[in-house]
Structure formats: C-alpha cells, structure tokens
C-alpha cells in the first residue's frame, strides 16, 4: 500500500471540560488536544489502517513533544517533522456546542 503524506500546520486546541463555556471554566482547567486539517487527515487514514506521514515544522519544547507522541500513538509517521529552536505552536480555543447553542472557535 502507498503512503499518504500530508503537509500542514498542527495547532494546540484548548477547550473547557464538557460543554462548559470559558466564563464557567476559567479560572480553572482547559483540556489541550492537537489538531489541524492535515494532521487530522493523516490520523484518520492511519486509524483506518493506512500508512501516513505528516510533514511540518514546530518548535522543540515539551508541549510539541507531547504532540509528537500523540501522533505516533495514532500510527502517524513523524520522522519528517522538523523541530526548530524558533517559532511557536499555534493555539485556538473551542467551546463545544450544547443543544441549541453552536460551538464557538476563537483564534
């Protein structure tokens, strides 16, 4: 089987637990997960049994090491990811929708 290679940005996704709004959760805890369209595609294909590689550049720090561990745990090949001593990991914030209230994304 061929390997699918995706190129793109991966970001940290911060959201309050459950269906809480930020004003209900803060000060307090936010959950950190990692997402980005291309990384999501690579992870989805890998979970279906396909071979995938993700290519990007990210700063080398403890948070991005956790991100790499997460991708590897989903069977996404990460050896082509460039770790740099500069730059930042992008962040975005999500409030999950509930009932008639839509989800809200803040960049």
What are these regions (language model features)?
Residues 37-38, 89:
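Short glycine/serine/threonine-rich phosphate/pyrophosphate-binding segments
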Residues 9, 36-37:
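Gly/Ser/Thr-rich helix-start
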Residues 4, 31-33, 55, 86:
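Short glycine- and Lys/Arg-enriched binding-loop motifs that mark or flank ligand-binding interfaces
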Residues 33, 40-51:
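Alpha-helix C-terminal capping segments
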Residues 51-107:
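Conserved N-terminal subdomain of the carbohydrate kinase-like
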Residues 1-23:
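Positively charged, low-complexity intrinsically disordered leader regions
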Residues 25-35:
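Short pre-catalytic strand/loop immediately N-terminal to key active-site residues, enriched for Gly-Thr
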């Amino acid at each position: 089987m061929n390997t699918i290679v995706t190129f793109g940005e991966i970001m940290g996704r911060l959201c309050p637990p459950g269906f809480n709004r930020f004003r209900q959760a803060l000060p307090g805890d936010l959950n950190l997960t990692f997402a980005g369209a291309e990384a999501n595609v690579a992870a989805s294909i890998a979970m279906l049994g396909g071979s995938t590689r993700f290519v990007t550049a990210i700063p080398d720090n403890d948070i991005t090491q956790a991100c790499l561990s997460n991708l590897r745990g989903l069977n996404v090949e990460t050896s082509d990811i460039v770790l740099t001593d500069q730059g930042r990991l992008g962040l975005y914030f999500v409030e999950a929708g509930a009932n008639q209230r839509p989800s809200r994304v803040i960049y």
